[in-house]
Swiss-Prot record:
NCBIfam families: gatA. It holds the Pfam family Amidase. It comes from Cenarchaeum symbiosum (strain A). Its EC number is 6.3.5.7. SUPFAM superfamilies: Amidase signature (AS) enzymes (SSF75304). PROSITE patterns: AMIDASES. Heterotrimer of A, B and C subunits. Belongs to the amidase family. GatA subfamily. It catalyses: L-glutamyl-tRNA(Gln) + L-glutamine + ATP + H2O = L-glutaminyl-tRNA(Gln) + L-glutamate + ADP + phosphate + H(+). The gene is gatA. GO terms for molecular function: ATP binding; glutaminyl-tRNA synthase (glutamine-hydrolyzing) activity. This is Glutamyl-tRNA(Gln) amidotransferase subunit A. Coiled coil: none annotated. It is an enzyme of class 6 (ligase).
C-alpha cells in the first residue's frame, strides 16, 4: 500500500518503505486514468526528478524535508519554465520566467511540482466551470463540481494525483473545494504566506494556502511555505513549528458557533452535521456556545464589491500592449485593438470587471466601494469582539452539499452565496481551516474553524482535534 498522506509519505520514503519514483509513477498513472481533469499542465520531467531524489537518498546525501513529495500548484502561481495560464485564453502559452516564493520554498525542500492545476479563470468562480480548459470533476462523484476556484488542486489531492497541493483563497477558494472533495483546506492569516508570484486578483484579501489529505499535512506544508519575504511587503514573521504542536488538543478552549452561518438557508443535512461537530468538539474538551456576527448578512455583497473593484484594476494591464493575448495588429486604432484583445476574457471575468468598473466609477463617487469598506471594518470589529470571548469560531464551510456540474451556471447570485460562510475570514484577514467531517448521501461535508490573526497554530490544533473525531470513512468509496 502506498502512503496516503504527506506526513506518511515522508516517513515511508525516509525509512525505505517506498520510493519517490514509485509514488510519483502511481500519481501520474492515476492522473491519466481517473478523468478528473485536475491539471492544465503536467510536469513531464516529474519521474526523472523522482529518480534523482531516490538516487540522492540511496547515496546518503542530505535531502530536503519533502523528500521528493509530488505537490501540485494552482495555475495562477508561477513556476519557472511551466505554463501559467490562470485558466484563461488571455494567457494561453505564457511561461513564467521565475518561481513564486512558495514554489521556491517547496523546491528548496526537494518537493517535486507535478504540474499546474485547473481553476476558474483568474480565480473568479466557485466550480472550475469558468476555466477556459473545461471543468474539473469531484472524485466522490464525477458528475459533481469539485468546488472552486482551486477545484483542480482539491480534485488532484482527493484522487491521489499528488500528495498535497497549493491553491489561492480570495473568498473561500481553498476551503470551498477542500470541503466539496473531502480534503483539508487552510487559509492562513493574511501576510503569513508570501503572495510573490501569485497572479493578482484582489490583493488586499487573497492568500495562498495548502489543500491536503490530513490536518498534519497542512501543518507540514505551512512549516515549509510560511514566513516573511522581502519580495512581498505585506508578509509577516512566522515562528513555524505548526506540525510539532499539532496534537496539543482543544481542552478548555471556547468555541463559538456563528449563528448566521448555521441557520436559515442551510441544507438540513449540513445543519445536522454541524450540530454533531459541535458535540464532537465538546467531547474533546472544548466549551461550546453560540455567537452572532450581525454584519455577516452584508459580507457577500461587500466582498464582491471590493474584489470586483480590485480585479478591474489588476486586469486593466491585459490590454494587449504589454500583457495579455498575443494577437496580430489588425488596426492601428488604439481602443479597437484593446477591445479585441479583451474578448479573450471569459464571461465570469467580464462580469466582475464590469461590476468593478461600475461600483468604482466617478459617476457614483465611489460610494458603493466605500460602503463595502465600511462593512468590512464593522465585520472585522464584530469578529474581534467574538474572538475576545471565544478562542475559535465554528461553522459549516459551505452551507450546501456539492452540486452537479451545470446546475447553477444560470444563477450567478446563487453561486455567489456558496461563499457565504467563507468570505468573513478573507475580509478580516483571519486564519481558517476546513476539515472534512462527515458524508451525507455519498458526498463530503466540511466544517470551518476560524481563529485570531496569527493564531494559525491554534486553528490547526483545533482542526486536528475535530479530524480525530470526524465521521469520515477510512477510505473514500472510489479507492
Amino acid at each position: 500500500m502506498l502512503p496516503e498522506s504527506l506526513v506518511e509519505y515522508v516517513r515511508e520514503v525516509g525509512s525505505g518503505g517506498t520510493t519517490c519514483e514509485e509514488f510519483t509513477a502511481g500519481a501520474i498513472e492515476r492522473t491519466k486514468k481517473q478523468g478528473l481533469d485536475a491539471y492544465i499542465t503536467l510536469n513531464e520531467k516529474a519521474l526523472d526528478e523522482a529518480r534523482r531524489i531516490d538516487s540522492r537518498i540511496k547515496k546518503g546525501e542530505k535531502v530536503g524535508r519533502c523528500l521528493g513529495a509530488p505537490i501540485a500548484v494552482k495555475d495562477n502561481i508561477c513556476v519557472r519554465g511551466m505554463r501559467t495560464t490562470c485558466a484563461s485564453k488571455m494567457l494561453e502559452g505564457y511561461e513564467s520566467p521565475y518561481d513564486a516564493t512558495v514554489v521556491t520554498r517547496l523546491l528548496a525542500e526537494d518537493a517535486i511540482i507535478t504540474g499546474k492545476t485547473n481553476m476558474d479563470e483568474f480565480a473568479m468562480g466557485l466550480t472550475t466551470e469558468f476555466s477556459a480548459y473545461g471543468p474539473s470533476r469531484n472524485p466522490w462523484n464525477k458528475e459533481c463540481t469539485p468546488g472552486g476556484s482551486s477545484g483542480g488542486s482539491a480534485a488532484a489531492v482527493g484522487g491521489l494525483e499528488c500528495i498535497a497541493s497549493l491553491g489561492s483563497d480570495t473568498g473561500g477558494s481553498v476551503r470551498n473545494p477542500a470541503s466539496f472533495c473531502g480534503m483539508v483546506g487552510f487559509k492562513p492569516t493574511y501576510g503569513l504566506v508570501s503572495r510573490y508570484g501569485l497572479v493578482s486578483y484582489a490583493n488586499s484579501i487573497e492568500q495562498i494556502g495548502p489543500i491536503t489529505r490530513t490536518v498534519e499535512d497542512a501543518a507540514f506544508m505551512m512549516d515549509v511555505i510560511s514566513g516573511a519575504d522581502p519580495n512581498d511587503a505585506t508578509t509577516i514573521e512566522c515562528k513555524g513549528g505548526f506540525l510539532d504542536g499539532i496534537d496539543a488538543g482543544i481542552k478548555g478552549k471556547k468555541v463559538g458557533l456563528i449563528t448566521e452561518m448555521a441557520g436559515e438557508g442551510i441544507d438540513p443535512r449540513v445543519a445536522e452535521a454541524t450540530r454533531d461537530a459541535m458535540a464532537a468538539l465538546e467531547d474533546a474538551g472544548a466549551r461550546c456556545g453560540k455567537v452572532s456576527l450581525d454584519m455577516v448578512k452584508y459580507s457577500v455583497a461587500a466582498y464582491y464589491t471590493i474584489t470586483a473593484t480590485e480585479a478591474a484594476s489588476n486586469l486593466a494591464r491585459y490590454d494587449n500592449t504589454m500583457y495579455g493575448y498575443d494577437m496580430p495588429i489588425e488596426s492601428y486604432e488604439f481602443h479597437s485593438y484593446i477591445s479585441k484583445a479583451r474578448r479573450k476574457f471569459g464571461p465570469e471575468v467580464t462580469r466582475r470587471m464590469i461590476l468593478g468598473g461600475f461600483v468604482s466609477s466617478s459617476g457614483h463617487g465611489g460610494r458603493y466601494y466605500h460602503r463595502a469598506l465600511k462593512v468590512r471594518g464593522l465585520l472585522a470589529r464584530e469578529a474581534e469582539e467574538a474572538l475576545a470571548e471565544y478562542d475559535l469560531l465554528l461553522s459549516p464551510t459551505v452551507p450546501i452539499l456539492p452540486f452537479k456540474l451545470g446546475e447553477k451556471m444560470g444563477d450567478p447570485v446563487g453561486l455567489f452565496l456558496v461563499d457565504y460562510n467563507t468570505v468573513t475570514a478573507n475580509l478580516t484577514g483571519k486564519p481558517a481551516a476546513s476539515v472534512p467531517y462527515t458524508v451525507c448521501d455519498g458526498l463530503p461535508v466540511g466544517m470551518q474553524l476560524m481563529g485570531r490573526p496569527s493564531g494559525d497554530a491554534e486553528v490547526l490544533q483545533a482542526a486536528y482535534s475535530l479530524q480525530e473525531r470526524s465521521r469520515m470513512p477510512e477510505a473514500p468509496p472510489w479507492q
